[in-house]
């Protein structure tokens, strides 16, 4: 999915102890405010359903066109030494993602009935799902799984078929911006009008490396939340350090980096060095 990047002596020890106390305080604030990241696939699915339902019920922004970025859990057989946990790419992910999108759609739709599906593109591992509502056909929800730039025609066709009263979701899209459809020409312009100008976020759980830190972003309607996950201290365990305040727009990399510099002034490698000096090497404890 994504790779994580891991970025003299009395002075370092004092700084480390101070930061550890600060990190603990920030973690408590994060937990109290309910910003903790999903701790399991089941929790991620539950929170995705809640966020999407909230977005659908929002009276503005019709027709409902939503993005979902779901962090697909690694297969049970994954080992720590595996360089690529998904050597089969999207084809390997698809069965897991199919179960996930079915669970989400079933949870989003009131009185969920049958969920039908079809393959839009076998080479691109792209599928189409329709979750019917037994309460009202206008409450059916459709979803396209793993749409790529090659599915622009399909997105436009399905958007028209779904109509203005029903919701259409793009889950784990394989593009980020209009330029991905080409720097010039009609495809770029069409993608902007058909996708980027119409779709808004319904739910997201994303991870990225920022200044060598493991950063998690979540979107739960209507806000984006951000935190850094620090797990270099074995005794303290994994800590979620709140970064930016909840905001309507996805946090920019520069804003995240500036906040990390404020709350974690020492880079990861220096904190690990301080821990080793204070407590000894992990295998010696």
Please state what every model-predicted region is.
Residues 24, 265, 269, 273-276:
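Composition-driven, intrinsically disordered low-complexity tracts enriched in small residues
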Residues 167-184:
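Redox- and metal-dependent alpha/beta enzyme cores, enriched for Fe-S-associated oxidoreductases
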Residues 259, 272-284:
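C-terminal structured domains
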Residues 75, 175, 248:
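Residue-level detector of flexible, active-site-proximal loop/helix-junction positions
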Residues 35-157, 161-166, 178, 276-281:
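Positively charged, amphipathic N-terminal segments that serve as targeting/anchoring signals
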Residues 65-69, 141-145, 167-170, 216, ...:
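Ordered hydrophobic segments in well-structured contexts
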Residues 179-265:
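A conserved mid-domain beta-alpha-beta active-site/ligand-binding segment of alpha/beta enzyme cores
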Residues 1-36:
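N-terminal chloroplast transit peptides
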């Amino acid at each position: 999915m994504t790779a994580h990047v891991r970025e003299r002596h009395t002075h370092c020890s004092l700084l480390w102890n101070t930061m550890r106390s600060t990190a603990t305080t920030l973690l408590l604030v994060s937990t109290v405010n309910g910003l903790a990241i999903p701790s399991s696939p089941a929790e991620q699915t539950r929170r995705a359903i809640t966020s999407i339902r909230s977005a659908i019920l929002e009276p503005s922004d019709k027709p409902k066109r939503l993005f979902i970025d779901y962090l697909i859990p690694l297969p049970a057989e994954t080992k720590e030494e595996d360089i690529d946990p998904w050597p089969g790419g999207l084809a390997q992910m698809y069965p897991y993602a199919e179960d996930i999108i079915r669970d989400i759609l079933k949870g989003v739709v009131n009185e969920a009935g049958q969920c039908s599906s079809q393959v839009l593109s076998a080479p691109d591992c792209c599928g189409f799902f329709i979750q019917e509502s037994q309460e009202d056909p206008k409450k059916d929800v459709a979803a396209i799984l793993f749409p790529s730039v090659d599915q622009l025609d399909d997105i436009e066709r399905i958007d028209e078929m779904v109509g203005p009263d029903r919701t259409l979701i793009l889950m784990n899209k394989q593009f980020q911006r209009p330029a991905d459809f080409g720097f010039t020409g009609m495809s770029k312009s069409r993608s902007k009008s058909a996708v980027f100008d119409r779709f808004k976020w319904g739910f997201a759980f994303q991870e990225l490396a920022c200044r060598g830190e493991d950063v998690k972003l979540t979107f739960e309607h209507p806000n984006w939340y951000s935190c850094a996950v620090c797990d270099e201290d074995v005794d303290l365990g994994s800590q979620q350090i709140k970064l930016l305040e909840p905001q309507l727009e996805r946090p920019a990399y520069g804003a995240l980096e500036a906040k990390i510099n404020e709350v974690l002034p020492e880079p990861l490698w220096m904190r690990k060095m301080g821990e080793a000096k204070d407590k000894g090497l992990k295998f010696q404890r």
